[in-house]
Amino acid sequence: MDSKEEAIQLITEEKHFSDDALAYFKTCIGGRDVGVNYHVISVFGSQSSGKSTLLNILFNTSFDTMDAQIKRQQTTKGIWVAHSNELLSNVDVNPEDKSDLFILDVEGSDGLERGEDQDFERKAALFAISVSEVLIVNMWEQQIGLYQGNNMALLKTVFEVNLSLFGKNKNGHKVLLLFVIRDHVGVTPISSLRDTITTELINLWETLSKPAECENKKLSDFFELQFVGLSHKLLQEERFVQDVKSLGDHFIMKDNEDYYFKPEYHHNLPLDGWTLYAKNCWELIEENRDLDLPTQQILVARFKTEEILNDSLEVLKSKYDSNVDPVIKDKLKLIQELSVLKTECLDMYDQHASKYVSAVYLEKRDELEAKIYLKFLETITLFIDSVSQDIFLQLVEDVNSESSKEPIFSKRLSNSTEVAKSKFEDIIEEFAAAKILSEEVKEEVVKRFENDLKETSDKLRVTALQKLITRSSKIINARIKDVVPQLLSNPDVDVWDRIMDKFHSIFSSTLIKYKLDDDTYDFQFGGEDEENNSTYKSIRVAAWKSLNDTIHDYLKEDTICNILRDRFELKFRYDDEDSPILWKNEEEVDLAFRVAKEYAFKIFDVLALIKTSDNVEVVPDINFHDSDEMYEDDLGIYHSAKFSHILNEVQKEKIQIQVRRQINVTVLDAKRSMIKTTTHIPLWIYAIIVVLGWNEFMMVIRNPLFVTLTILILVSFYFINKFDLWGPVKSVAQTAAGETIGTIKTKLRDFVLEEHEKTPKIQSEKSNSDSEKVVENEKS
């Protein structure tokens, strides 16, 4: 186990925490699991007070020390850390019992090099208190009783910030403040010096601005105090070494009441955890502004430079609108005008503010420049938005141009995007080169444009992809509608095999130009594999939907009935040579009926379910249904809505009944026609007619009137039959007959009415005659 490691700079003088700290600690412990068996000691005090020398002697470290014979100056810069297992003491320690010690050498306070800038020494002191178990406060005996000399002002600030940052999280944790009084000659006893320092610290603690949760806390709740005097190193070297050994005993002798490594001082973190804790503490301390206490010069400089900044900015604003508005659409004039305004504003600030503290002057100048950039950004943004819109319009036009020399969309889009980006960056670079646009704003504007450009490119790609999907789907749909109904109109038992072969052939031929050797697809839109797969699936879904709709729309109940009836009639009415069949008897009709019926219904089950000739149901290789695979019919019965299911049981039964009725009618018609063709007048009837009608026939021939009438009748019959005028003749005959019957009915009605009217008159006259006779008889 190495007892000594070269020190590294844990925190630089520029306040950066080392990224190599954890690796250094691991190197120090050599891969051992030390757990929490380690200790952290820090030293704090004025510059050139011998802090590094004390640490090197006490802990056997190798921190750089000042050579007083050459020059008294700053030696330790920042905060350094070293590892050791050795302690100078009067006690021999077993090597296995030695702890790993990490010693922090903190840059001295009140140094000439930093002057009034006390920011780092405050933060370094606060960091040392926050991460250490023991903080050695190194001071000269003659500094005791002073306020600045013994760092009381610094400790006050550190205590206040320590309470605000870490006070509520202490949970009983304490830090040992070990005051090492150098060059103690013994005139003033240590007890007296201890009382003086303790009183000063208690009084200082009472004056602190404490947070509410620490209002009643005492100094002893956070810190324990120990005091040690060391003789003069040069004048009393032997006594000095002995005093250091006695000091080392307190770090080793655990049974000693004044043992310095008490458990309540430890942070109880493993070494890698302590490293992260230390880094977080430094970041928290670095961000805290309560430690940035400016000097009076800085306060004045800040006030005056702020005033000058505002005046300069007001002058710029007063000229801004009148100078900028007329040239806002002219890039070159706009850049020139903004540059002039910025130069005038900064020159005015420089003229009046450069006399103050340089750091503050430069800080405020940067602030003024940032405000100028912010003011300019409003105008530049308007100009850039207008330019961006023109660039995007040109991009869309170039990408969608049909006259482009680049046929592949992805390359066309990529080339157009690069042109648009380059054009925009050139414009922005002109503003940045004129220093009227900060680098941060430039990067932000370019990033925003790139985001908008990506969004526009993505939209163009999505639109083009959608067009491709739509175009491919339409092509596939049209070809499916040409092929599938034709195959289904004259189906065979292997109709579904042929339809599926056609379907896959149509799909493959449509997308063949996008297919790669590994059976994947690249639609040449510059998308990733996932986007190409999504496009392929969309086209595949559209193809399956088209096939599904075409089949299910075509194979309705009536269509299937017609297909079955046509198949029946084809087999029933025509022979194998497509010639009409003339039946001789009913047995032939019945036989043909059975054969044709079997032939017709052979295809019925094939049309009811989409399956291959191997009796395997066809299942789409992609899900394209938007709803459940069940639907409810008008009767409230649920049926499958799968692609392969054409007919349910109810529909199948309905179709069978309807087809049977239709083919039965066809058979009856066939039997009737057979009876008509077989029923005729016997030949002997014609012989009897000739024998019996011979005289009448001769009479007609010998009579010119009968001959002429017969010729007219035969000619009329010929023309009526030739031109198929039987319908009109029949209509005329029916009309004439109707007119004749109507006339006869009218005449009969008139006759009956006349008779009815005559009868009452006769009866009346007869009655009158009878009454007259009765009267005459009565008179006589």
Swiss-Prot record:
Localization of this protein: Endoplasmic reticulum membrane
Entry coiled-coil feature ranges: 440-463
Binding site for GTP: 45-52
One function term, GO molecular function aspect: GTPase activity
Record key words, sorted: Coiled coil, Endoplasmic reticulum, GTP-binding, Hydrolase, Membrane, Nucleotide-binding, Transmembrane, Transmembrane helix
Location of the region described as Disordered in the Swiss-Prot/TrEMBL record: 756-780
Membrane topology value: Multi-pass membrane protein
Record EC number: 3.6.5.-
Pfam families: RHD3_GTPase (PF05879), Sey1_3HB (PF20428)
Ranges where the GB1/RHD3-type G domain occurs: 35-265
Lumenal side of membrane: 702-704
InterPro entries (alphabetical): G_GB1_RHD3_dom, P-loop_NTPase, RHD3/Sey1, Sey1/RHD3-like_3HB
Cytoplasmic compartment segments: 1-680, 726-780
Membrane-crossing segments per the record: 681-701, 705-725
Matching HAMAP family: Sey1
Protein family membership: Belongs to the TRAFAC class dynamin-like GTPase superfamily. GB1/RHD3 GTPase family. RHD3 subfamily.
Protein name: Protein SEY1
Lineage per the UniProt record: Eukaryota, Fungi, Dikarya, Ascomycota, Saccharomycotina
Gene this protein is translated from: SEY1
